Amino acid sequence: VSICTGINDVWRQFDVPGIPSEACTPDEYEHNLREMIERTRDKVLRLFLATPYFMEPCRADRMRARMDEYSDIVRRLSSEYGCELVDFQAAYDRFFEHKHSAIIAWDRVHPNQIGATLMAREFLSHCGFDYGHMPVEK
């Protein structure tokens, strides 16, 4: 089972700041994520926790900084509960060392095909998927 949550929780703090009831605070986020982990972990073979992400390379950007807070919660809980951490933000940050974020998401939240492929590759790398042993079509 994989859990990736928090992106809209952060986004709502910036796209509808006048409606605070729409926002999920870091404390609420941690409580909710902890509850999901505790209700799931003993029922599955492996539990993957994925960091929320914001496709913005500038860590000083207010929304990126807030997303990093939520990602830190995921990292901490992943370690605490022994879950497999899939760090989507780190994967995107590696991409941003070479390309602009607009290449993978016009709004910095919803990935296009390239962005989704980066996510898939990052997730599969934590599942033991070996790209060197792909079946060859005959």
Language model feature labels by segment:
Residues 1-137:
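Alpha-helical cap/lid subdomain in secreted, periplasmic
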